[in-house]
């Protein structure tokens, strides 16, 4: 059980499947609502696997320390945080492709995490390099993730909040970029993808304005994590509609010998 700042982490019990977790002062995570409940089979899998693989992030007052990822995963390995993991298609595929990297999937709704748990159950949960957090990703970054601890942060297809009056709700604002940069290790990677041109411009401006982040070209630079991802349902939908997916990548200034060896 982990305490830190305004957050309290515990096994995910007692929540309705469509119950959002309270947000922090920074922009709340822009994850599309998943309003329908989970199935009986998903609930049974949840009850069996969640105590080992999951944490529930709730607002609380006691101070404490961030999640001990070494204890949680049972090893010392590079850690990637995926924000808005949805049903976990990308999460599982990328984790399987990089067994030496540990992945923490964060989402604000239980339904997607339940789908990911079922997918994990099908391939076998023993030794799986994935853990799950049900909660607001900004709160998790603030209170459950230590500074200089992540080799990567992935944000695939966050809600673009297209109306101008809703732009303040977008996840990837300058303040969030600064928080992500603080949590990345030197040479750690921020990988974002969107099919919304306006949001892509917004993300690009916010990332380029963060002094600790620098744009990278994955075709010419050695990165500590893979940036090859499977097509998501949102990407396929965009392609069918004639849209294009825009990939945005930055790395944190600085480089360590460990970072280059973990690939």
Curated annotation (Swiss-Prot):
EC number: 2.1.1.33
Species per Swiss-Prot/TrEMBL record: Mycobacterium tuberculosis (strain ATCC 25618 / H37Rv)
Classification lineage: Bacteria, Bacillati, Actinomycetota, Actinomycetes, Mycobacteriales
A Pfam family hit: Methyltransf_4
MF GO annotations: tRNA (guanine(46)-N7)-methyltransferase activity
Enzyme class: transferase
Role according to the record: Catalyzes the formation of N(7)-methylguanine at position 46 (m7G46) in tRNA.
SUPFAM superfamilies linked to this entry: S-adenosyl-L-methionine-dependent methyltransferases (SSF53335)
Binding residues annotated for substrate, in chain numbering: 163, 195, 232-235
Regions crossing the membrane: none
This protein's UniProt keywords: Methyltransferase, S-adenosyl-L-methionine, Transferase, tRNA processing
CDD domains associated with the record: AdoMet_MTases (cd02440)
GO cellular component: tRNA methyltransferase complex
Recorded metabolic or biological pathway in which this protein acts: tRNA modification; N(7)-methylguanine-tRNA biosynthesis
Swiss-Prot/TrEMBL GO biological process terms: RNA (guanine-N7)-methylation; tRNA methylation
Catalytic reaction annotation: guanosine(46) in tRNA + S-adenosyl-L-methionine = N(7)-methylguanosine(46) in tRNA + S-adenosyl-L-homocysteine
Active site positions: 159
Note in the entry: Was identified as a high-confidence drug target.
Family statement: Belongs to the class I-like SAM-binding methyltransferase superfamily. TrmB family.
Listed name of the protein: tRNA (guanine-N(7)-)-methyltransferase
PANTHER family: 3-DEOXY-D-MANNO-OCTULOSONIC-ACID TRANSFERASE/TRNA GUANINE-N 7 - -METHYLTRANSFERASE, PENTACOTRIPEPTIDE-REPEAT REGION OF PRORP DOMAIN-CONTAINING PROTEIN
């Amino acid at each position: 059980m982990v305490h830190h700042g305004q957050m309290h982490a515990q096994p995910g019990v007692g929540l309705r499947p469509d119950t959002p977790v309270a947000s922090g002062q920074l922009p709340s995570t822009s994850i599309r609502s998943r309003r329908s409940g989970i199935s009986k089979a998903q609930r049974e899998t949840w009850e069996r696997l969640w105590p080992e693989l999951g944490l529930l992030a709730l607002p609380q007052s006691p101070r404490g320390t961030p999640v001990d990822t070494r204890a949680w995963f049972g090893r010392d390995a590079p850690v990637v945080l995926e924000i808005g993991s949805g049903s976990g298609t990308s999460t599982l595929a990328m984790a399987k492709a990089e067994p030496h990297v540990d992945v923490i999937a964060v989402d604000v709704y239980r339904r997607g995490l339940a789908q990911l748990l079922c997918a994990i159950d099908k391939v076998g949960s023993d030794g799986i390099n994935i853990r799950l957090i049900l909660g607001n990703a900004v709160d998790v970054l603030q209170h459950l993730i230590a500074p200089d601890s992540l080799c990567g942060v992935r944000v695939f297809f966050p809600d673009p909040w297209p109306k101008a009056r809703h732009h303040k709700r977008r996840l990837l604002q300058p303040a969030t970029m600064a928080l992500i940069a603080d949590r990345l290790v030197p040479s750690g990677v921020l990988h974002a993808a969107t099919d919304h041109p306006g949001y892509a411009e917004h993300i690009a401006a916010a990332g380029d304005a963060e002094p600790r982040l620098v744009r990278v070209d994955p075709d010419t630079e050695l990165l500590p994590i893979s940036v090859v991802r499977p097509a998501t349902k949102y990407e396929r939908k965009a392609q069918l509609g004639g849209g294009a997916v825009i990939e945005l990548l930055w790395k944190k200034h600085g480089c360590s010998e460990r970072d280059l060896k973990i690939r």
